[in-house]
Amino acid sequence: MRQNIKERKNKMKGKKVITYAVSFLVALGCVSAFPVTVKADTGYEVYPNPHSMNYSDGDYEMTSQVNVVYEDGIDEDTKARLNEVLALKGMNASVSSEKKAGKTNILVGVKGSKQYVDSQFGTTSAGLFDKLDSYALKSDKGTISILGKDTDAAFYGLTSLYHIFKQVEGKTIRNFSIEDYADVASRGFIEGYYGNPWSTEDRCKLMEWGGYYKLNSYFYAPKDDPKHNAKWRDLYTEEEINTKIKPLAEAGNKSKCRFVFALHPYMNHTIRYNSEANYQADLKVMQAKFKQVIDAGVRQIAILADDAGNVGGANYTRTLTDMSNWLKELQPSYPGLKLTLPFCTQEYMGWGQSYYRDFPENVQIIMTGGRVWGEVTNNFTSSFTDTAGRGPYMWINWPCTDNSKKHLIMGGYTTFLHPGVDPSKIQGIVLNPMQQSEPSKVAIFGNACYSWNIWQTEEEANKCYNASFKYVDHNGYEETEASTALRELSKHMINQNMDSRVTRLEESVELKEKLNAFKTKVTKGEKITDEEFDDIINEFTVLQNASQTYRASGNERIKSQIVYWLNCWDDTTNAALNYIKGIKA
């Protein structure tokens, strides 16, 4: 009798624990089996999705020695991208001024240059090169040609070729053509979260990776650099320039995911507008600071006025006009210097002000979407455009975890980036990520896809989301056990557990009903069949295996930044499996 009572107590204890474990799983998540999928032979996979990609009959064998023709307007970083492409197949290049018989020819040029590649390329769709960052790429019977709107656009064409070369078997490539462009001018991420700052290596690695997906902006606004804000008037020391600024500028220029250096001159020791002499003196201080980083390699700057006192529309307009004119004066001496000037307004949480219409045309107006945790929606972008006379530069506070640091936010594509938004009413989109730079790539990949070619449906967004994990994990099109495990884990690490200020993100969607039904039976003490037990045991086992798989073979940098969550999966699944099996017995 005592033994039976003890057994019943142990079973009741087990039921309480498994109720807790399943409740935890509903909150944290669970995974189903994760077989590696094989891509169907439907063509080359390129992300972001090109606007147009077509295939012609046939293919050809590329030669190991290729002949390359570069036009004068192609910069060294774009040439380096082609060398990287060729290295994927162990191919070597010699450079000449025209096509050579007996070799695969690769031609890289700029539209409208009237040089060799421009004249040889042939026709393209009307209006293609009126679009942002547009390029045409074609592979045709032994010749690969890339024609860009400028050298950056040619770089994007070569980046598409990079992803195609990764899928080429041997050296046999299909005949195809791509015509492509960006929907949004500025695409990237901003280091503006509250939390542990990224290291210089984190920042460089993220820019390098972003360059493979046609991102063009790493917006520098970290909380750990006093010379960005509190001491914005002070120049950097030589050591700071060499260890902090130059490496970031170099990584940004090489990847074309440029290091956008921002100053916040409106919060501490602010620009003075109380006299002409004071204003001119402060303007020179700000220009000297920007000039220092431009000399160190920075090729785009930005100005912030958020969370500070409002100095008035006329004063903002004057400063932005003066800075725009100054950039125009500098540009001839600094190749690649961007005239585009992002500006974060004091009213960044609002819906726009009419005085923004007075800003110079090159100024991009940074807004968060009508609230702090705003979203890219037609409602906001259309309303703002009607008021300001131009589209907003969207600062989206996702997937940042400022108010939920115990969480990883590994999803939310269509919640924050709505399908079908009019691209003509958006000038930029940057995401504010988590303090964990590497897992933030899942969301950043979504922005890369969206800002280049805005998805029209949830299905398109889901396709990008499911594809993201292989590109996040190993920058390639092939599914691996590790990337599949990361995807399955991530589907259950999405909800940010915040208040009504932010739209709730759902996780564990595919398993929620099953888990809740099991939890109800455990709680009520209802009979659970062996099949139901085995089903839940399988789910926990697959989850356990996913964690172990990623720990064993996943990306080292990602693993190091999500190790506490992997540990949590291990502990939870061990406890849950032991108790479930105990109850079943």
Where are these regions (language model features)?
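Acidic, contiguous N-terminal accessory segments
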Residues: 23, 40-141, 169-178
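Catalytic-core regions of glycoside hydrolase
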Residues: 166, 193, 308-462
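Bacterial N-terminal signal peptides
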Residues: 22-32
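Sec-dependent signal peptide cleavage junction
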Residues: 30-42
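Short, Lys/Arg-enriched N-terminal segments with co-localized hydrophobic residues
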Residues: 1-11
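Conserved, mostly hydrophobic/aromatic
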Residues: 68, 150, 189, 210, ...
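C-terminal functional modules
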Residues: 456-585
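Feature activates predominantly on carbohydrate-active enzymes
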Residues: 124-289, 296-299
